[in-house]
Amino acid sequence: MGFPGTWMTESESVVYRVVPKCACSTIGQVMYYSDHGTFFDGDIHDATSGIHKWALEDSQSLIEENVTKHQSYAFTCVRNPYTRILSSFFDKICGIQRNGKRYRGNLVPLLIQKYGIQVEGDFDQVASFRRFLLFARDTIRWRRPMEPDIHWSAMSGHISTYIVNGGRYDNIFHTETFNEGMQSVLDAIDKKHEVDLGAMPRFNESEGHGPKRAHPVEDYFDDLSKHLVYEIYKRDFNLFKYDFENPGNKLPKGEIDLDEVHAKLGE
């Protein structure tokens, strides 16, 4: 199976397991800059040179050898499950993508027809989001009406493939304390170019795709919604130390235990 979703600097200074909706655009640009002294001109997801990616055939053997021998510092980044799925809804369901089209073509018409979701004009964001949550749960639990999408499938699922196939993380940090976490990675590796995290832009490539969130995070999650979120993301809350009880508290409640993550996700 290899290491899907894994990126590595050309210098092999660091390896990163991408988790969608968890600052991956910014992280990719930091990696690129640390090698080249300049940011990639465009969305780093579109880069086909200057950085190794599992999706690029020529990179696969290099990544596989590096990861299985643990030759480089390896990390990933996680995010509060409440804000992550909200972000997925506004970006992927309500938004227009980089190519000027709706995400995955017929997905939004399917949601409008089967789940009664609205995405146009001055729609009821809370009601539509809660219906989207039912859809997300259906895809994850029953794989219908489609397979789960990488942007709302559990973070633990993405992170576990790296472990199960022979990799080990040296660091997993929280998006909510991004500068501190990313700096801890940069401090641990040999890099060709220093990166000033405080001065660099944030490469939030999904920003502006969809409407702005009109309410506080907690307003989107009633008791049923919280139940659905916990059903989907139970392992994410527990392993990455987020507060399930209070959707309004986006900050983690504690430090991530790497040994626990490897033990539970390596099974």
Briefly describe each language-model feature range.
Residues 1-267:
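Membrane-interface amphipathic segments in extracytoplasmic regions
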